């Protein structure tokens, strides 16, 4: 695990003419769910394109600990699932490392079973609140033991028979919605989730693909009601995981802000609940061509061609936040090179990510000469076209707080700043995008990692 290892700073320097074609690693959301649903479904599931970052592998290990058989042959992961309702009690605590998604979804999946399951994680995950997932599980009859503030370690024990509930999700959170639906898989009757604002819908699409009896209705106000019939049969599937739009964001923004760049990114997931960043960048004047649109496994996929663009500041509509919550750090970097002011509101979710992502972004921008204001749930960035004066002539490292997206965002910033940008640690990039350094330097980006000092 990289989180226990020595931090390894990295520095990005002004680059030009980033060029090439790349394939982004598989989508993290779909990869987590592929392991989970494949491990739960009866029969064999085959997965290609899986994101093999630490977070997803930890989800796979958790499914193995509960009875799924998982092996890799060539580029294909093959899972023999246990069958819905047939998970086994894990003999040891389930360690999710840094993976909030894997941890919260698995709590829903296994929490309603009539046995004890214990969840642990790394220092970053142990600080993150789990109450939003634990509250609906309590309503279903699950007994919860947790550290103060509903934090890890958490031990769950389901009732003899869980109660199906109707749960209105109090905030825009795909993780909470998904956890309740997954708990509903082993609950008799109909479990209903009411979602006031649509969030990423991979759980619904994929559960339907695996054979769950799940329906979605959307009313005139956009409120979605999702109903799942519990204890039905799930059957193994063949899945080709499309490229992760959140990882795509880094080479995409690099191509926009580095002069002379022309990059093509293949096989990108274009699910409408995930494309807020692309839409926002296009509104800022980004030259992004969407090519070869197609469907893969019920999901929209396309190739993107991105070229260097003169960006202009915009006000991002607040209701777009759920569709790009993970992309605000790298959007803030793009805004630092745009003409004028970019205003981002509705960012309260960023306070409870791997780090307090909002203050981490604002602090990193200020350190590197960007004029910005951090509000309670907002960020205002006043850009400097061409990156004049941005970066650091000497010393000064961006504090990443063990957060992979902060690290990658600021390394992208350094590629177009007048002076270099250094992050205090790049080891945790492996949690979501292990190939980041290799792909970026392959395009011509000047990024160097510090040598590992002997411990």
Curated annotation (Swiss-Prot):
Stretches for region Disordered: 1-23
HAMAP family on file: EPSP_synth (MF_00210)
Subcellular compartments: Cytoplasm
CDD domains: EPSP_synthase (cd01556)
Species per Swiss-Prot/TrEMBL record: Rhizobium meliloti (strain 1021) (Ensifer meliloti)
Pathway membership, UniProt: Metabolic intermediate biosynthesis; chorismate biosynthesis; chorismate from D-erythrose 4-phosphate and phosphoenolpyruvate: step 6/7
Family statement: Belongs to the EPSP synthase family.
GO MF terms, alphabetically ordered: 3-phosphoshikimate 1-carboxyvinyltransferase activity
Summary of the function given for this chain in its UniProt record: Catalyzes the transfer of the enolpyruvyl moiety of phosphoenolpyruvate (PEP) to the 5-hydroxyl of shikimate-3-phosphate (S3P) to produce enolpyruvyl shikimate-3-phosphate and inorganic phosphate.
Protein name, as recorded: 3-phosphoshikimate 1-carboxyvinyltransferase
Active site: 326
Keyword Transmembrane: no
């Amino acid at each position: 695990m990289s989180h226990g290892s020595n931090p390894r700073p990295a520095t990005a320097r002004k680059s030009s003419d980033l060029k090439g074609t790349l394939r982004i690693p598989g989508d993290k959301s779909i990869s987590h769910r592929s392991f989970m649903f494949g491990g739960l479904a009866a029969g064999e599931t085959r997965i290609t394109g899986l994101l093999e970052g630490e977070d997803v592998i930890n989800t796979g290990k958790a499914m193995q600990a509960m009875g799924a058989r998982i092996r890799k042959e060539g580029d294909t992961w093959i899972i023999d699932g246990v069958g819905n309702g047939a998970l086994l009690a894990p003999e040891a605590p389930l360690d999710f490392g840094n993976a909030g998604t894997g941890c919260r979804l698995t709590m829903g999946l296994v929490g309603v079973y009539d046995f004890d399951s214990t969840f642990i994680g790394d220092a970053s995950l142990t600080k993150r609140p789990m109450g939003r997932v634990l509250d609906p599980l309590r309503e279903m009859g699950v007994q919860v033991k947790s550290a103060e503030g509903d934090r890890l370690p958490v031990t769950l024990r389901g009732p003899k028979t869980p109660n199906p509930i109707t749960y209105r999700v109090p905030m825009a959170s795909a993780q909470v919605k998904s956890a309740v639906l997954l708990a509903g898989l082993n609950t008799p009757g109909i479990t209903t989730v009411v979602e006031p604002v649509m969030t990423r819908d991979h759980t619904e699409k994929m559960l339907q693909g695996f054979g769950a009896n799940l329906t979605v209705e959307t009313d005139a106000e956009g409120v979605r009601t999702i109903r799942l019939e519990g204890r039905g049969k799930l059957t193994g599937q063949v899945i080709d995981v499309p490229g992760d739009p959140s990882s795509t964001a880094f080479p995409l923004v690099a191509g926009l802000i580095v002069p002379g760049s022309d990059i093509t990114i293949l096989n990108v997931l274009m699910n409408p609940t995930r494309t807020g960043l692309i839409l926002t960048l296009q509104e800022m004047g980004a030259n992004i061509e969407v090519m070869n649109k197609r469907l893969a496994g019920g999901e929209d996929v396309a190739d993107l061609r991105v070229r260097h663009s003169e960006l202009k500041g915009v006000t991002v509509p607040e209701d777009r936040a759920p569709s790009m919550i993970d992309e605000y750090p790298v959007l803030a970097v793009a805004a630092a090179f745009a003409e004028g002011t970019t205003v981002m509101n509705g960012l309260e979710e960023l306070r409870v990510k791997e780090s307090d992502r909002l203050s981490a972004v604002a602090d990193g921008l200020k350190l590197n000469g960007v004029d910005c204001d951090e509000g309670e749930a907002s960020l205002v960035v006043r850009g400097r076209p061409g990156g004049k004066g941005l970066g650091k002539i000497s010393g000064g490292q961006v504090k990443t707080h063990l957060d992979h997206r902060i690290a990658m965002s600021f390394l992208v910033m350094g590629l177009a700043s007048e002076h270099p940008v250094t992050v205090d640690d790049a080891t945790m990039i492996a949690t979501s995008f292990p190939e980041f350094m290799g792909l970026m330097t392959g395009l011509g980006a000047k990024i160097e990692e510090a040598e590992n000092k002997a411990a």
